[in-house]
Regions:
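Hydrophobic secretory-pathway targeting helix
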Residues: 1-24
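Structural detector for short beta-strands of small beta-barrel domains
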Residues: 26-54
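Extended, hydrophilic extramembrane loops/domains of integral membrane proteins
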Residues: 78-115
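Transmembrane alpha-helical segments that form the functional core of multipass membrane systems
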Residues: 122-128, 134-229, 239-250
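Pore-lining and gate-forming transmembrane alpha-helices of multi-pass membrane transport proteins
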Residues: 193-197, 201, 232-233, 237-249, ...
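Helical hairpin unit composed of two closely spaced alpha helices linked by a short loop
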Residues: 252-262, 266-312, 319
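Hydrophobic alpha-helical transmembrane segments of membrane transport and translocation systems
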Residues: 303-375
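Positively charged N-terminal leader segments that act as targeting/secretion signals
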Residues: 367-368, 375-390, 394, 398-399, ...
Length: 412
């Protein structure tokens, strides 16, 4: 893990580029606190009870940036899409536009959610540590490493022209190995879970590749393809492989969950009953995995449906009929991603069962040894003979012994 972090941080593996889709050099975002609401004209929204619309005259104090400490007065426009209602003491994000040869223009961008997010993260970390203990701490370390690899390596590599498939598989390899090792340590269970995870992700990748070829899908079918092509012209971004990369990264979490659960269960069964054969262990793993398949399948499908819900509603609002909706690029991409990831999870169950059963029952053949009790008796007899040669004059307890032709000695 440490080596990969150092490589990602210090090796110049990407080219520098200052390309941006928009020219926002004149815009700055700073934190601010509302000192007072000087005047307001707000009306209730008839279509959405509890929301208001209108305008407010507010005075704010800037808390960050080069203008820290200054006080400004501005108009806050409250609309349905930008609905930030200011009150005294509220912390907000302020947008400062400073074009050339013009006065600075201030607008309320959004709520300052930094403190709330820190509180939520702290609560999450605390619960994981309390419930999970030491292993919970290792899982948090694995999560931090995963986030680091995604933002510091995957996004940067794909943006600057790396193959999305290569960058995606390297990300899966690094994060999968680190997460599984931190959870299980250097054990056969860890090896089994890691191999099953890689095999499951590979299955998801193969299934997506076949489905994408059959449905004529690529990154150019994304809604954001036009903007991505502009980036491609400047940085060498490979638009066509973006969906493939997204599928294998999205499938990693669920596949790893199933692989670790199955391998851990089979390790426990093997420790309680070491005489079970590999076939019996695999059968037990399949029985355990069948219950997991139903819940994990629902989880993945519902996750993809939830992410696509608002877009499908929007398409329906445009008057798309069912046939047109089902044949749209967006629905085809979402369905293909969901099916590929789900089938990868399902196939992980037999893969994890087979790999775990094989590894747990893999024992080195031990050479045949003579009866240890006979060896011990022979050793004792030789010891007494050795003692009689060198310690004849020492007073010892009287005893007599008779050695048989086979080397065993009888004492009386």
């Amino acid at each position: 893990m440490l080596v990969s972090v150092l490589v990602i941080l210090f090796v110049p593996w990407h080219q520098e580029s200052n390309f941006s889709l928009v020219n926002n050099t004149s815009m700055h975002y700073v934190r601010a606190r509302v000192l007072s609401v000087d005047a307001e004209s707000l009306q209730s929204d008839d279509l959405e009870p509890g929301r208001v619309a209108g305008a407010q005259e507010i005075t704010v104090q800037i808390l960050s940036g080069s203008l820290k400490g200054q006080t400004v007065t501005l108009t806050n426009y409250v609309t349905r899409s930008v609905n930030v209602v200011c009150k005294e003491g509220l912390r907000i994000i302020l947008c400062i536009d400073t074009p050339e040869n013009a006065e600075a223009y201030y607008t309320v961008y959004n709520y300052d959610r930094g403190g709330g997010l820190l509180l939520i993260f702290g609560l999450f970390i605390g619960i994981v540590l309390v419930v999970g203990g030491k292993r919970g701490g290792f899982s948090l370390l694995g999560l931090a490493y995963t986030v680091f690899v995604i933002f510091a390596f995957l996004i940067q590599a794909v943006y600057y022209g790396w193959s999305p498939a290569l960058a995606g598989f390297l990300t899966v390899l690094l994060t999968g190995a680190a997460s599984v090792y931190l959870i299980g340590g250097p054990t056969r269970k860890t090896v089994a879970a890691f191999l099953a995870t890689m095999a499951g992700v590979l299955c998801a990748a193969v299934i997506y590749t076949v489905c994408a070829a059959a449905l004529h899908l690529s990154g150019y079918n994304l809604d954001t393809a036009e903007s991505l092509i502009l980036i491609q012209n400047q940085t060498g971004l490979h638009v066509s492989g973006l969906i493939f990369c997204a599928v294998i990264v999205a499938a990693l979490g669920a596949v790893m969950d199933v692989a670790v659960s199955v391998s851990s269960s089979l390790q426990e069964i093997h420790q309680l009953n070491p005489d079970r054969s590999a076939k019996e262990l695999m059968h037990s793993g399949m029985n355990i995995g069948k219950d997991m398949i139903g819940t994990m399948t629902n989880t993945l499908i519902l996750a993809f449906v939830g992410s696509a819900l608002t877009t499908v509603i929007l398409l329906k609002g445009y008057g798309y009929d069912m046939a047109l909706l089902l044949n749209s690029d967006y629905v085809a991409i979402e369905v293909t991603e969901g099916i590929a990831a789900t089938l990868g999870v399902i196939l992980t169950v037999p893969l994890a069962s087979a790999i775990s059963a094989w590894l747990f029952t893999l024992e080195a053949k031990k050479p045949l040894q003579s009866n240890p009790s006979k060896k011990k008796r022979r050793t004792g007899c030789l010891a007494r003979r050795f003692s009689s040669l060198f310690f004849q004059n020492l007073p010892v307890k009287a005893h007599s012994s008779r050695c048989l032709p086979n080397g065993n000695c009888l004492s009386r």
